[in-house]
Amino acid sequence: MKRAVVVFSGGQDSTTCLAQARHQYDEVHCVTFDYGQRHRAEIDVARELALKLGARAHKVLDVTLLNELAVSSLTRDSIPVPDYEPNADGIPNTFVPGRNILFLTLAAIYAYQVKAEAVITGVCETDFSGYPDCRDEFVKALNHAVNLGMAKDIRFETPLMWIDKAETWALADYWGQLDLVREETLTCYNGIKGDGCGHCAACNLRANGLNHYLSNKAAVMAAMKQKTGLR
């Protein structure tokens, strides 16, 4: 039996990954992390979506220690979430240091226990947000270290790594989940479901991608299929 673990936030990217995993694996587990994030509503959204999309199990892990160590606008109400700035340089204040290091490592430990062959994460380098822990180089390096540390061959899969946000919408549509992803996921840094606040970087990237996909469906779908190998 083929098993996978999805690092699952209930946002657009991880929900699209879950939708795909349900078609590619016999058994899919979801792991969601409570780190005291500003947008904690995502945990309830993740619970609902994991059930709706047929995950075998859904674990919510308490990692609130990360909140104490990592200062970010996503972990501190006193730090405002910035509006989208198209030409902003450097690492944004929404970056949570160590988040993906911790999430992927814990997901791999869980995968070890349930005998899953893959950990799936929705990180993406194409629409690079300034987060160093979303890079392909980082994921591969951590995957190598985790496998050495557990003497186990667990594969970190990044199905969105080389597709842009419009193509991610196309992927959701390919698996028949465009409306669900559009209406029921929570991507917004300010914790607003669906289309979100419309001002933060996450909402801007999501909306621009959706508009581009809806305006150029055939071309974007074809590009997504070419990059992912889907038919």
Curated annotation (Swiss-Prot):
GO biological process: queuosine biosynthetic process
The family this protein is said to belong to: Belongs to the QueC family.
UniProt-listed PANTHER family: 7-CYANO-7-DEAZAGUANINE SYNTHASE
This protein's name: 7-cyano-7-deazaguanine synthase
Xref: Gene3D superfamilies: HUPs
Cofactor list: Zn(2+)
Positions with a binding annotation for ATP: F8, S9, G10, G11, Q12, D13, S14, T15, T16, C17, L18
Domain of life the protein comes from: Bacteria
Species whose genome carries this gene: Salmonella paratyphi C (strain RKS4594)
